Amino acid sequence: MAEQWDLDEECLRRLGALTLEQPELVESLSLQGSYAGKIHSIGDAFRNFKSLRSLDLSRNLITSLKGIQYLCSLQELNLYYNNIPSLVEVSRLQPLPFLKELDLRLNPVVRKDTDYRLFAVYTLQTLEKLDDRAVRDSERRAAKLHFSQLGNSENFLLEVEKSSREKTMKNCVTDEGPASHVSPEVDARMETDANKGLFIPFPNREIKDSLTSICAAQGSGTPAQKLDVFPLGTQMQEATRRETSDLHQEDELRLYPPPQSTVRSPEKMTRDGYRVSFLDTKSSGSSPEKDLIPKPDAYPCTHDASLGKRLDVGDSNQILPCQLPSEVCLDHYGNQYSQTLCLHGSLVKRAQKGKNYREHSIKPSQDKKATTSHPCGDLLTSLSNPDSSTGRLLRLSSDLYATTHFNSDPALLANVEQQLSSLRDFTPAPGSFPSSPALGNSLRTLLLPPGTPENREIPTKRSLSPSRRGFKRKDGILANPSLKRGFQDATGSEAQPLSSDLGSLHGLSGNHSPPISARTPHVATVLRQLLELVDKHWNGSGSLLLDKKFLGPARDLLLSLVVPAPSQQWRRSKLDDKAGKALCWRETELKEAGLLVPNDVESLKQKLVKVLEENLVLSEKIQQLEGTAATSIVSGHPSHTHDELLRKNQQLTIQVACLTQELTQLKRLEETVALLHESQRSLVVTNEYLLQQLHKEQKGYSGKSLLPPEKSHPLGRSSPFGKSTLSSSSPMVHDTGQYLIQSVSEADPEPSLWS
């Protein structure tokens, strides 16, 4: 096992090989741990290293950073794979004024504390890079939002860590006990923190009372009801977030979810991060998150109060400057939104506060003029002249709108019916009544009997999107002949701009929504893009709250669900419909002006048919050209031919190189064959000479057979190779000669090699 060292200056010099250098001149130092030993504590070893800028203490067992404050010039600190236990040790780096890079990966503090990165960014203001990742401005803002009111004492940091551990443990365990146990636990924990002298960043003391009352109210419910207990640290963070969001209401970016979707704000900091859920059904009931939220300024969630807090999705570039209260369920807004009139974002103002909405929801029948305080009524009144009949009818339309959209009393309904009865006998003068789709829809709603099929379709139309609802209202008005005769607009200069303005306000300028079958893949694409956006910009808990690079694209994606982009085929058909409608509109204008003859109408219709036919022919030609271009690309392209030539050139070059190598090998083989020829010739000559010598010895042996044996061994003669040749009387000489002849015959190469 590796040794553990308590670092001092002598050990530091030995490990860093600083035998002769002065400590004041050292600027970079690497003290990585190894199998031989690891540093356990640093102590006062760096007291004299005033100029040290880069320090590497990775792969050690350091548990305390006490003594790091002496490195006043330190810019880079690597504590990778150590044993830093808590945020208290991280706060010891605060006296380093020039620290820019810090690496604390694989330390226990990173694993245990969920808010470690935000705390490090908030504590070390000069930090530019943390854990090999750049520190973003959004992280600095989120850290400031979370820790702006926290103290710097070690006791408080320890308490924060304790609450973080409690939160981690209680997220894994579901408390099934009675809800009445919550209030004493929260109260006791708060009293304990107050006795320790800790600063609790609650905006006021009433939050504790509200928490107690909420817990008591929930305790009187059914015994089988389950309640999640949240630790004190989470409540403190929530209170801090609520107070700072109220103070910086105009500076911080607000979240405006579209209808039919619910964006749950991160009231509770869990390890899962933030959740974004899209709900197509109604409200899913209360959750423990909303049960523990303090409600000092709760708005009454009535049918009328929600009308002033709708979201305008007519223009994705403009958002209403009003903030939704976090207590009101956003599904309620999504359901009520379909019953309201979609106005342009630049014309809807914050004319009333929450008090006015509450008074309006409680007393709708005290004053009949109270309904004109709605933004629709203000808009219609401002666009009309109060002295003319047009202004009177517009005011009447606002009353009708309020009547059809509010739960009014019978007296107000009777008054409206009386005004409508007088309106049936009224013959409109030229230019006195604009053809407003909203007016026609409101009047059609009251004029039709309750049993008619068109009146039965109104609840189903309310569930549609605003753009589809607006178009169906317009088509219904144009399709109803009685209303068209009763409210047809005559020639006039004021009627056309006013009706066009109202049409643009209600999104009636051609913004049809595509069919549901075309919208389904669009929703899946938007969800996938939103998840990719979250993965790209998420840097820990609370990092997406103030990240404008994330909030802008996310808002556009969510708004595209309400007003999706139409398909190409659908857009082409709508363009044709728009051209036909424009021609019909021009035709009606010319008819009213008396400048158009019926023959001209027929000729214009024929021209329109010709134009449409030419459009079809041109589209077919475009498709044919695209097909020919595709086939030409598949058949061959000059760039492809060039590539093939290059490839062939490379192949030929490789073949030339191979042939050159083969030629070199052949030359070497020829040289080897020539050498073999010379060797063979010399061997043949030697063999012939030896055969001659053997024949001579055999002849001499036959003449000397009578000599004694000891004298029958004459001295050998010298051979032409400088070797003595033994007499033929020895049998070994004969055997040796035979072996030599045999070996030469075996060494003789094949005839094919000499050819």
UniProtKB/Swiss-Prot annotation:
This protein's species is Mus musculus
**Where is coiled-coil annotated?**
601-671
Q: LRR repeats: which residues?
A: 51-72, 73-94
Give the lineage.
Eukaryota, Metazoa, Chordata, Craniata, Vertebrata
Compositional bias segments (type: Low complexity): 498-510
Q: Which residues form the LRRCT domain?
A: 107-146
Q: Which protein is depicted?
A: Leucine-rich repeat-containing protein 36
Residue ranges with Polar residues bias: 721-731
Note the InterPro entries from the entry. CEP72-like, Leu-rich_rpt, LRR_dom_sf
Q: Which PANTHER family match?
A: HEAT SHOCK REGULATED 2 (PTHR23311), LEUCINE-RICH REPEAT-CONTAINING PROTEIN 36 (PTHR23311:SF6)
- Gene3D superfamilies reported for this sequence: Ribonuclease Inhibitor
Q: Where is the composition biased (Basic and acidic residues)?
A: 356-370
Residues covered by region (Disordered): 354-374, 448-517, 701-755
What keywords is this UniProt entry annotated with?
Answer: Coiled coil, Leucine-rich repeat, Repeat
